[in-house]
């Protein structure tokens, strides 16, 4: 196996890592993640990051704009893969950082960290194109199964990919979920990864076909029950990079600028300081290139679907 720091530098350049090294990385990652709780405790200061979706060069910009992994703590809210041209390199870079700096980075599972979704939205095809088989995809999917479902910052900020669930009122209930499996089509684990905030009075069916829509009543109830001040989540494209809702009780953070190389949005990360103050850093996309090094030209009409 290549040395970890050598793999990190190779991935940062978007270059090929051999299959045996990836297998070893994924096995080590599973062993490390196996010992993490469903909801990981994180101290401040920390930087909270939203969806990445395989946009490696923008991920590198994210680290550059926010101080870097060597001196800062990070929480990534999931959706590392699919849609972008460098899903594998983006996910493996974060896995390497987790192995290199285990106390500095938390990787939460998103709705795209599943076998079913990655077979449809790009990650599976990317791996087969780059390696000629699906072995590396399988290794990564096994890591997905061990990713935690949430994080709690200073017992005051609850971090999750999607949102809330009618089956979960307390954070302690999330800790009892058996997470080490493919994401189910319904139930608490599914909802945490798929639900969205909306201006609704009560739980409503989601147009995504999974999870629920939830409003301020449910957010206020969750905040009060768990004595937390903020829900930080991702999962939805926000043109301005972040969006606060429900009197500041919830924020959506989006960290993939010019999403799908065509949407024209900026990206953001959220830093929570020791005194619990919030500071957003906004950044724009770098010039996107495909896996062959060719500049990607934006399409004229973005066509979005519900599986963000």
UniProtKB/Swiss-Prot annotation:
Modified residues (Leucine methyl ester): 308
Cofactor(s) listed in the protein's UniProt record: Mn(2+)
Enzyme active site: 112
Cell compartment(s), UniProt: Cytoplasm; Nucleus
Pfam families noted in UniProt: Metallophos (PF00149)
Enzyme class: hydrolase
Keyword hit for Chaperone: no
Binding site for Mn(2+) 2: 79, 111, 161, 235
Residues reported to bind Mn(2+) 1: 51, 53, 79
Any one GO MF annotation of this record: metal ion binding
Catalytic reaction equation(s): O-phospho-L-seryl-[protein] + H2O = L-seryl-[protein] + phosphate; O-phospho-L-threonyl-[protein] + H2O = L-threonyl-[protein] + phosphate
Keywords annotated in UniProt: Cytoplasm, Hydrolase, Manganese, Metal-binding, Methylation, Nucleus, Protein phosphatase
Gene3D superfamilies reported for this sequence: 3.60.21.10
Record-linked InterPro entries: Calcineurin-like_PHP_ApaH, Metallo-depent_PP-like, PPA2-like, Ser/Thr-sp_prot-phosphatase
EC number, UniProt record: 3.1.3.16
Protein function: Forms the histone H2A phosphatase complex in association with the regulatory subunits PSY2 and PSY4, which dephosphorylates H2AS128ph (gamma-H2A) that has been displaced from sites of DNA lesions in the double-stranded DNA break repair process. Dephosphorylation is necessary for efficient recovery from the DNA damage checkpoint.
PANTHER family hit by this protein: SERINE/THREONINE-PROTEIN PHOSPHATASE PP2A-RELATED
Subunit field text: Catalytic subunit of the histone H2A phosphatase complex (HTP-C) containing PPH3, PSY2 and PSY4.
Protein family: Belongs to the PPP phosphatase family. PP-4 (PP-X) subfamily.
Protein name, entry field: Serine/threonine-protein phosphatase 4 catalytic subunit
Lineage: Eukaryota, Fungi, Dikarya, Ascomycota, Saccharomycotina
